[in-house]
Design a protein with these regions (language model features):
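Enriched but not universal
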Residues: 1-26, 156-177
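Short carbohydrate-recognition loop motifs
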Residues: 29-47
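Short beta-strands within extracellular/lumenal beta-sheet-rich domains
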Residues: 43-61
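A short beta-strand element within beta-rich, extracytoplasmic domains
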Residues: 62-77, 138, 157
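Short glycine/proline/serine/threonine-rich loop/turn segments at secondary-structure transition edges
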Residues: 64, 122-135
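Short, surface-exposed beta-strand/strand-loop-strand elements in extracellular ectodomains
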Residues: 80-93
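Extracellular carbohydrate recognition and processing domains
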Residues: 95-127
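Short beta-strand-plus-loop segments that form exposed binding edges in beta-rich domains
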Residues: 139-148
Length: 177
């Protein structure tokens, strides 16, 4: 098995506050461990903020796509503050999965990485296909927010896949293997 990480590469919509620039996707593609050291993130001071991004295309040679796993990194440094992200993995045609991060507690200085449920199908029975992966969108809502400023800095989908079986028709010492 092999894996590849698909990062955001296009904006669809957004109402979070951007720390810099004008592209949401560009603020969600790097991992930083501490809130204070980060200069590339989305932020919000109230529940209801949402963004939708498209992901990079899956272009790996493969024989089978086994699963996808969504990861987000966010944090809120305010004392006793917490937040909840709601994620929707889908396409322009609708959502495949909606999942809550659960309560992410304040961590004063560090971001918190949340790994969501690994999904082996798009709908409970249909296997992932390259075309499906190449049209993926992720929506992230700040579903709950107690105080302070929530920062959202990273989003990725890890695709686990089988590489194609190599066929080797080498002739060694006059014998075809």
């Amino acid at each position: 098995m092999a894996s590849v990480v698909l990062l955001p590469n296009a904006d669809v919509s957004n109402d979070w506050t951007l720390s810099t620039g004008s592209d949401v996707y560009a603020l969600l593609d790097d991992q930083v461990s501490t809130l204070g050291a980060d200069s590339s993130y989305l932020s919000s001071t109230s529940a209801g903020s949402a963004c939708v991004v498209e992901l990079q295309d899956f272009s790996e040679a493969h024989s089978r796509i086994n699963s996808v796993t969504l990861v987000t990194v966010s944090g809120n440094g305010a004392r006793a503050a917490s937040h909840v992200l709601e994620t929707r993995l889908g396409s322009a045609g609708g959502d495949y999965y909606t999942e809550s991060s659960g309560v992410i507690p304040a961590h004063r200085t560090d971001y918190v990485t949340k790994t969501y449920t690994t999904r082996t199908t798009t709908d409970g029975s249909t296997a992932w296909a390259e075309a499906t992966l190449n049209s993926l969108r992720v929506r992230v809502d700040l579903d709950a927010h107690t105080s302070g400023t929530t920062q959202f800095t990273y989003l990725a989908v890890t695709v686990d896949y089988d590489e194609p079986v190599a066929t080797d028709n080498s002739i060694l010492f006059g014998t075809n293997f």
